[in-house]
Amino acid sequence: MKKFLPLSISITVLAACSSHTPAPVENAKDLAPSIIKPINGTNSTAWEPQVIQQKMPESMRVPKATNSTYQPEIIQQNQQKTESIAKKQALQNFEIPRDPKTNVPVYSKIDKGFYKGDTYKVRKGDTMFLIAYISGMDIKELATLNNMSEPYHLSIGQVLKIANNIPDSNMIPTQTINESEVTQNTVNETWNANKPTNEQMKPVATPTHSTMPINKTPPATSNIAWIWPTNGKIIQGFSSADGGNKGIDISGSRGQAVNAAAAGRVVYAGDALRGYGNLIIIKHNDSYLSAYAHNESILVKDQQEVKAGQQIAKMGSSGTNTIKLHFXIRYFGQSVD
């Protein structure tokens, strides 16, 4: 039995060695017994291979890890800019309701202040009144914002600033009010456009600092040759009393010609003022305006120059229940007979 003991040990050693992965070698001399060493220098049967470190071949490319370049803030900002541009481009994608015959905007079908852009590109048929109306602004406010003065000349493609997105503490804020207040204030502003301002009413300073009252009574004669705006009977005369008729009402037939009482420039043509129907206001000079209300249809456009006696409308009953023309004259913003 003792003769077989060395053989058993040899088999065990060979089995233990065969269970380990051979260590890498570079040449035959690396097969020397020094490649493997017993742990702690003992004669234990547990063996540990000594691994020889090899360098990666220089010709082999080693992939390098890189960090992500994702930048969510920049992408978000770009998206916001794109959305903003798209929004602005779509803002003017609308049509203004207009009378098919005269091309005059039908303000009763337009929501005051619906346009929310910060700029507006002028299109064919636009007026300062219309742009101010759809932007919820006052005409003077719009003109001041764009450094414009009367007469307001617009050109197609012209870009106007709108006060919707301009944080200016000096800007008068627009208010949400009902349509009757909007139209009354807007047309009254045009109706009173030639009324003297405070600066105009202040006399030139004198050493005694005396003041001179402004005479708002129209002169007995003027350089305007007035003519009757239409034929017919006066069914209601002028009254200076509070709530009185600030003009005259002339009866007639539907479609009868309504003519300019004097030469001038149309400063308003539309139906924004309730109670007056289709209304035309003509500015004759710095002192006088004339108005023509309740027309069946309007034949002139805003800013159009007209001659005395030129037909500007057809008589009708818009804004009332009687076919008539309401005709009125204002001198420095005051109704006169």
Swiss-Prot record:
Transmembrane segments: none annotated. Keywords: Cell outer membrane, Lipoprotein, Membrane, Palmitate, Signal, Virulence. A lipid is attached at residue 17 (N-palmitoyl cysteine). It comes from the Bacteria. Gene3D superfamilies: Glucose Permease (Domain IIA), LysM domain. InterPro entries: Cell_wall_metabolism_enzyme, Dup_hybrid_motif, LysM_dom, LysM_dom_sf, Peptidase_M23. This is Outer membrane antigenic lipoprotein B. It comes from Histophilus somni.
